[in-house]
Amino acid sequence: GQAPCICDKGPSGPCKICGEDPCICKKRKKLRIKLRDGKEREIQHMISTSFWSADGKPISAEEFLQNLFGTLPEFFKNEEELRTIWSNPVTRKVLLDKLSEAGYGKDELSTLQKMINAENSDLFDVLEYVSYAATPVSREARVLSARENIFDGLNQKQHEFIDFVLSRYIETGVSELDQEKLPKLLELKYSSINDAARILGGAEIIKQTFIAFQKFLYSRRAA
């Protein structure tokens, strides 16, 4: 009953961004790291973050970034090849598996995603930023830009399913577009795979539709 209020607000819990309680986001330092292409990349300095070299030794974030920058050309020659690989769930999985074997697994890439303030973006944006200093695009903006091309040619039922998949992608990330996730997505939307097959025209059409739309999601026009 007093003004200003003196009520105990209780613990606020750790910050969703920095993971600290109280939040230390404003205290974070930004590091500018010049890579071998002569361009700078900006990352957040996160004291609690540890990176490791291929031989298991602790390294700095700068060393990690330099090493990743030097390694990525082994997997794709240019931005267009990265885009082509990433736009197909089969080749994307192969790339992610190879990166993981080289010491750049999803955990490391997700940490780097936080450090470049791209948590609402795609892992594609992380690789593109490191390789070509391209500005990350939010998943929502990517979807909005590509919607017209994605839905062109789909019937109403297919439109509804892909719209559902895209909503999951915006909420969670690129892992929702993995082929392994397709059965779960169908069950979430239609309760059973049999019902999904009946509504959407069969297993093969579902698979083709799920793979085909991703090409438009990652096309240059959508970036």
Please place each PLM-identified region on the residue numbering.
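Catalytic cores and motor modules of nucleic-acid processing enzymes
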Residues: D8-A223
